[in-house]
């Protein structure tokens, strides 16, 4: 598996489209917004997995204790259930490196507090 450092440059607008079609039904990025089926992703970068206040995470997410950054998200988004066995997230992942890079570009800007 290629790493984020080998990924193509991400495109914010393409990532926004991916978020709206693949992620927004379960997540929001809006500061102060409540959780949906999944946690609010605002402030995602630099945060440890399973620590968003007010959201009930699986033990797997809490115990993984990964700090979210471009590299960890790139690997996670390929196959969430393989990266964190036991996660509640039902999303199958993004197989294309460009899609993952685009989504990360969007999330990096859209989730900054």
UniProtKB/Swiss-Prot annotation:
One of its GO terms (molecular function) is metal ion binding. GO terms for cellular component: mitochondrial intermembrane space. Its main location: mitochondrion. Keywords: Acetylation, Electron transport, Heme, Iron, Metal-binding, Methylation, Mitochondrion, Respiratory chain, Transport. The modification N-acetylalanine is found at residue 2. The modification N6,N6,N6-trimethyllysine is found at residues 81, 95. Heme c binds at residues 23, 26-27, 89. It is found in: Mitochondrion intermembrane space. Pfam families: Cytochrom_C. Binds 1 heme c group covalently per subunit. Electron carrier protein. The oxidized form of the cytochrome c heme group can accept an electron from the heme group of the cytochrome c1 subunit of cytochrome reductase. Cytochrome c then transfers this electron to the cytochrome oxidase complex, the final protein carrier in the mitochondrial electron-transport chain. Belongs to the cytochrome c family. PANTHER family: CYTOCHROME C (PTHR11961). This is Cytochrome c. It comes from Fritillaria agrestis. The gene is CYTC.
């Amino acid at each position: 598996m290629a790493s984020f450092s080998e990924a193509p440059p991400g495109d914010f607008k393409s990532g926004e489209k991916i978020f709206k079609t693949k992620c927004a039904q379960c997540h929001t990025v809006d500061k102060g917004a409540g959780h949906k089926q999944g946690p609010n992703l605002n402030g995602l970068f630099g945060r440890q997995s399973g620590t968003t206040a007010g959201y009930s995470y699986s033990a797997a997410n809490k115990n993984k204790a990964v700090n979210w950054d471009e590299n960890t998200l790139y690997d996670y988004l390929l196959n969430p259930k393989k990266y964190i066995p036991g996660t509640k997230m039902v999303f199958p992942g993004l197989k294309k490196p460009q899609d993952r890079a685009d989504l990360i570009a969007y999330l990096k800007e859209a989730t900054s507090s």
